[in-house]
């Protein structure tokens, strides 16, 4: 006759096998053979970005009517002033520039030109 410890171990093994068999049949009945989780769906792509429409933007803003009407003209005038400033800076005499801008923090004429061009690139 086997000892009590051996009987307990055999009973535990049989019990575990029964539970595993029961679990297997429950998963096959549900249509999921095995225990794999369902596959993860692929991520949905983001919606396409809407192209910027300046006229639509101006309609939505709460600017004054005069600003809405004239902003294009003012932008063109500002662009013309900036471009003429660049041309003026390129044609400016170095000695006249240094005489007019002493103590303004410019090391040389080329330094001032480079700073101004960097400023124009930013804005």
Swiss-Prot record:
Induction: Expressed in the late phase of the viral replicative cycle.
The organism's place on the tree of life at top rank: Viruses
Bilayer disposition of the protein: Single-pass membrane protein
Disulfide bonds: none
Regions that span the bilayer: 5-25
Keyword Lipid metabolism: no
Assigned GO CC terms: host cell membrane; membrane; virion component
Subcellular localization: Host membrane; Virion
Family assignment from sequence similarity: Belongs to the asfivirus CP123L family.
Protein name: Uncharacterized protein CP123L
Native species: African swine fever virus (isolate Pig/Kenya/KEN-50/1950) (ASFV)
